[in-house]
Structure formats: C-alpha cells, structure tokens
C-alpha cells in the first residue's frame, strides 16, 4: 500500500480533567518521506445554530475547500459560526474552543505539539448525515511533514470540557 518503513503509535489518556491523545509517527527506514495527518474529531452538538468556535481566527489564512478550485482566503471573524456547508483549513490556528450555548458547555481543543492547523467541516443542509447534530473540528498537520530516516514526529492534543 505504501512503500515506506514506518510505525505509528496512538495513545489516549482519560483523566477527570481531560482527554489527551498522542500520535507518534516514526520513520523506521533509511530514506526520507513526507506525510500529512489529521484527527477527524466529530463533536456532538445541540444544534449548529447554538455553536461558536472561538480562537485566533481573525486574520488567519484558510484554504476554502468549498470553492472551485479551492483557494486561500483571509478570515475576518475571531469566532466562527456555521450557517452553510463548510470545509476550511485554518493554517496556523492550533487552539480553539467549541462553545455550545444549547448545552451550556464549552470544550477547549488544545494542540500541545505537532498539530499546527485546524480544519472545520460541516455538511450543512445534508439531512441524511444529521448535519445539525455535529461539527467536525480537526487538529491537523496540513502541510507536508518530512521525516528523515530514523526521525519521528509527535502530535499531542488535549480536550478539556468546561462551562460557558
């Protein structure tokens, strides 16, 4: 399937305060290769109309994958709301908070290492997918990561629940 030597370890730790993940990608061969990675996290929400994704989005460059062809844009908003089909890669935005006023809860998405970008995706309007009951907020390493022979890359994520 892929002719490069590698090993991937994925660790999940659950405490009273957070859910923590660590993904380690190791090049176990001699030749360098590139890879991309993302954690496709689908979060249960009360309704998209109650959702805000807060973070350092204002001024950030994002790849709008809904455009044909996809192109880079600049985000004007500090907090994101979803009212249409959405597929964007926010480059350099690695921490954010998912706020759900319908549940009165918030979830801090803290990318502690490796994950440099955030992907926000919603199939808004697709009833068959239950679009109004979830939002995908992915921790990503969108640009190619190069691993030399024997080298490794680590991505660490903490999900910390809280109130509004």
Sequence positions of predicted segments:
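Beta-strand-rich recognition/accessory modules
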Residues: 85-164
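Beta-strand elements of well-folded, non-transmembrane domains
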Residues: 12-16, 25-29, 41-47, 141-143, ...
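Acidic, contiguous internal or C-terminal segments within carbohydrate-active enzymes
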Residues: 1-35, 39
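Solvent-exposed alpha-helices and their adjacent loops that cap or buttress functional pockets
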Residues: 3, 45, 128-129
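Beta-strand residues in well-ordered beta-sheet regions across diverse protein folds
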Residues: 22-24, 54, 138
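Active-site/ligand-binding surface loops and adjacent short beta/alpha elements
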Residues: 30-117
């Amino acid at each position: 399937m892929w002719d490069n030597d590698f090993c991937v370890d994925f660790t999940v730790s659950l405490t009273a305060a957070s859910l923590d993940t660590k993904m380690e990608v190791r090049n176990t061969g001699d030749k360098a290769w590139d890879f991309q990675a993302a954690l496709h996290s689908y979060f249960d929400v009360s309704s998209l109309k109650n959702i805000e994704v807060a973070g350092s989005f204002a001024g950030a460059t994002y790849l709008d994958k809904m455009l044909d062809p996809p192109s880079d844009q600049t985000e004007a908003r500090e907090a994101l709301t979803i009212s249409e089909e959405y597929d964007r890669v926010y480059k350099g935005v690695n921490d954010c908070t998912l706020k759900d006023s319908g549940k009165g809860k918030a979830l801090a998405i803290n990318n502690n290492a490796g994950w440099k970008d955030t992907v926000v995706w919603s199939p808004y309007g697709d009833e068959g997918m239950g679009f109004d009951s979830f939002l995908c907020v992915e921790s990503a390493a969108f640009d190619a990561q190069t691993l030399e022979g024997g080298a490794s890359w680590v991505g660490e994520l903490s999900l910390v629940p809280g109130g509004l």
